[in-house]
């Protein structure tokens, strides 16, 4: 879109038109990458885009950081296999969405990434998670007994020596204690541990992590909200 066309459109219209060109949906990061801000008289265009997607009646939120056009709602939800009344379909999409974000962040930090076999064909936007994950098979960084635990963790980041630096478990409705038990088994590695969940589960996390059995890892496990 040329600058003359941009001058005739409001900022909201420009955001909507950009989302159309992206297929009717986009992450906030993607919008900021492809938007032409040359005619915007603001020093903080990214903040303006955030305000627009949050307030526009023409745009709806699929997940935090992921937005779509109301005019394309049915098409987009079918594309992502989301049935709004089906809690399970929403959970499956959300789980893969946050796994995909974690894989992308790992790449930005120049780390290698892994997702477990059972999740590799789940969709992150228009790609399967396997396309974002560096390792199809988890690196053999320890004994088989511990690898069996590690290979079920939702996302792992590895350094250049193929040693794990970060373990992430994405929790929607499953028992957080199960994830903490995995981290407990993996505590001897020089790694950080994270539970990624809705903020409404933070009290549950605090209750579980304060159990005496998890005292050796309490200071190393962090809770991250969506």
Model features per residue range: what roles?
Residues 2-11, 38-84:
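Charged low-complexity interaction tracts in eukaryotic proteins
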Residues 2-29:
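Positively charged, polyanion-binding regions of nucleic-acid-associated proteins
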Residues 11, 98-99, 151, 179:
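Amphipathic coiled-coil/heptad-repeat helices and related helical stalk/stem segments
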Residues 20, 107, 187:
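Anion (oxyanion) recognition and catalysis
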Residues 30-35:
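A short acidic, leucine-rich amphipathic alpha-helix
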Residues 49, 78-117:
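Nuclease catalytic cores
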Residues 85-91, 107, 115-162:
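Active-site metal-binding core of divalent-cation-utilizing nuclease and nuclease-like domains
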Residues 133, 139-153, 159-225:
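Catalytic cores of nucleic-acid endonucleases
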